Design a protein with these regions (language model features):
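A short, structured active-site edge motif that brings together acidic residues
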Residues: 65-78, 97-101
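N-terminal binding-site loop/beta-alpha segment at the start of enzyme catalytic domains
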Residues: 1-68, 83-84, 96
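Glycine/proline-rich, positively charged
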Residues: 80-101
Length: 101
């Protein structure tokens, strides 16, 4: 896997799985399959309405969370503050942190 190193030293996998508009079982299986073949960068958003499925795919893959780079995004009018949006996404994904928001 190739990485891009950001100015702060964070390494971001160049190849990522975008999870836009996946349905429940399709989303879970796509995430699990991607991780199985070596993807380590998962990109989702609350706006996609599938963070629960993406999180389930991550958990069911069995991979250690620390080995993944998880990205989520905020829709400008979805939440009162970015902090509330981040907390909501972490709860939906059932993870303790998001690598990039």
């Amino acid at each position: 896997m190739e990485y891009i190193t950001m100015r702060n030293g964070t390494k971001v996998p160049m190849l990522g799985l975008g999870c836009y508009k996946s349905e429940e079982q399709e989303g879970v299986e796509a995430v699990k399959s991607a991780i199985e073949i070596g993807y380590r960068h998962i990109d989702t958003a609350n706006f996609y309405e599938n963070e629960k499925y993406v999180g389930r795919g991550i958990r069911e893959s069995g991979i250690d969370r620390e080995k993944l780079f998880v990205v989520s995004k905020i829709w400008p009018t979805s939440f009162k503050t970015p902090e509330v949006a981040i907390e909501y996404s972490m709860r939906s994904l059932n993870i303790d942190y998001i690598d990039m928001y």
